[in-house]
Amino acid sequence: DMLDCRTAPTPYRSGLVYDRIVPDGDTLSPAAQTAIVTQYQSLIGALNWMAVSTRPDLTVSVTLLAQYNTTATPAHLLGAKYVLRYLSGSLDHGIAFTSQSASSYLSTTYSWPKDDPLLTTYTDANWGPQDASKPHPGDLITLTECCSLLGSISTRTGGPLAWHVIREPRVSRSTCESEIKSADEGTKVTQFIRHLLADLHMPEITLPTTLWNDNKGAVDWTHNCANKKMRHLNIRNMAVRDAHRCSEILIAHLPGALNVADLFTKEHKDDAHFLRLRNIIVPPRGKFPTPGGC
């Protein structure tokens, strides 16, 4: 029963990195393991509905937890219930849009984003393991946990239109490479939204959509300023350059502290940083813009 649970400041349990939870299915009876998996799948399904619909701040935690839908352990179940504790303390947060750019919570927080009324995309990546740890002799390191998390969010009129978190299928050799892959994923979403805006005859599609990224090397690579260390990138990643060349997107650099896509790339241990980004994307009800809030 989680109706009267204690609230939590973030969806991430301190000291519990999902990728490092040791499976203990061998110590449970088949019936007990089945019961845990069934309860876990039901809970993750409900959380996933919220993460893809109205609560972008849940996306990373739900994405990581969903990897263990068929092999869940009691520790994974505790992690999922911790997300419920976070939700219990943030019920008044939600997505808000406004027709008046200057009154949006995005703009009033600080001078961000740069093109609030227009479609704007932010991308980021977290290179390597979630806890940024270096393996010790004898440690078992899986390929999965070494694959970076790629995140992006597309905003317009002060609120998020689309967001996603994916785990790259292959390990990146550098931070720059993982950021380029993130920009590629963000470009695909941006192009899709631009098609919808074209169907609605929105005038902004005559201009390139700004795509912000906090990695200078990735931005320079998009502008054809590459070096021999990046020659191994494949044709798939070249699609970012092609979209830039065709003026569909304009990739620009912004400081990492201002990149709201950072919310979608890691299990945050800095509560203050997480809450600042959370309040920008899904502001509390008292901060909803008026008129135009929803």
Place the predicted regions along the sequence by residue:
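Short, conserved catalytic/metal-binding micro-motifs enriched in Asp/Glu and His
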Residues: 61, 138-141, 145, 261-266
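Structured nucleic-acid-interacting core domains from mobile-element enzymes and related host factors
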Residues: 85-125, 204
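C-terminal reverse transcriptase regions that engage the nucleic-acid substrate
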Residues: 1-99, 103, 255
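RNase H-like nuclease fold core
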Residues: 47, 113, 118-176
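Active-site palm subdomain of RNA-directed nucleic acid polymerases
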Residues: 50-61, 149-158, 189-211
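Conserved pre-motif C helix in the palm subdomain of viral-like polymerases
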Residues: 32-60, 126-142, 171-195
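RNase H-like nuclease module associated with reverse transcription
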Residues: 68, 118, 166-294
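Mobile genetic element proteins and their domesticated derivatives, centered on retroelements
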Residues: 18, 47, 55, 83, ...
